């Protein structure tokens, strides 16, 4: 490039946008190449000017986390989500109004990533972290309730299921179907899950 300083931010944005489009249309290999290229550029730009480019870097890392989750490369997904979360925590400390929703979104996805792998303690940890920052983002409570239930903490889980029953009933029930398909519900918790399903269906 004749003048990379001028054009690299636009190039990274174009790559990131196209990478997201490819992810949404399941062209995962193409998506990964573009997002990795965008991340490399944005990482370089963020070193020189963090205030301007760190949010873009975190956004690309978050999108890569989603991509890797979709293709079940969970370790890489975790790495990207954690990198994005670290940036969002820093940004939220300075400007909570703008960045809290992004931080909560990253916590939510990390929580579900750990749920999907049967790591219920870590799922609880990130659900609580997200809820601490923004109690209005209620979908994070689907992960918190499930992580408690599948650890055998029925009473704590039941309280959340009842509190958000009207608002999140369909999400709760579809999560259970997903967990059954993944085979992550411990046999000793199956009766508890059925009890909650009946409770939600009343």
Where are these regions (language model features)?
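Boundary/linker segments of alpha-helical solenoid repeat arrays
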Residues: 45-46, 91-93, 98-100, 136-141, ...
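Residue signature of alpha-solenoid helical repeat architecture, marking inter-repeat boundaries
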Residues: 2, 9, 48, 52-55, ...
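Conserved alpha-helical positions within TPR/SEL1-like repeat arrays
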Residues: 9-24, 55-70, 101-115, 139-146
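Terminal, low-structured helical/coil segments at or just beyond the last alpha-helical repeat
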Residues: 167-202
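TPR/TPR-like (Sel1-like) alpha-helical repeat modules
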Residues: 81-85, 146-172, 197-201
């Amino acid at each position: 490039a004749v003048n990379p300083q001028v054009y690299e931010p636009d190039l990274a944005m174009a790559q990131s946008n196209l990478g997201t489009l490819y992810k949404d249309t399941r062209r995962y290999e193409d998506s990964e190449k573009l997002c990795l290229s965008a991340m490399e550029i944005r990482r370089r730009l963020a070193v020189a000017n963090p205030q301007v480019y760190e949010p873009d870097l975190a956004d690309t890392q978050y999108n890569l986390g989603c991509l890797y989750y979709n293709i079940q490369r969970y370790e890489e997904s975790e790495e990207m989500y954690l990198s994005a979360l670290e940036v969002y925590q820093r940004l939220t400390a300075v400007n909570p109004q703008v960045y809290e929703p992004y931080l909560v979104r990253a916590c939510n996805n990390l929580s579900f990533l750990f749920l999907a792998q049967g790591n219920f303690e870590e799922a609880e940890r990130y659900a609580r972290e997200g809820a601490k920052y923004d109690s209005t983002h209620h979908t994070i409570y689907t992960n918190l309730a499930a992580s408690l239930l599948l650890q055998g903490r029925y009473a704590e889980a039941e309280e959340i299921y009842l509190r958000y029953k009207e608002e999140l009933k369909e999400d709760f029930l579809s999560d259970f179907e997903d967990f059954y398909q993944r085979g992550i519900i411990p046999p000793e918790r199956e009766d508890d899950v059925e009890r909650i399903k009946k409770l939600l269906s009343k």
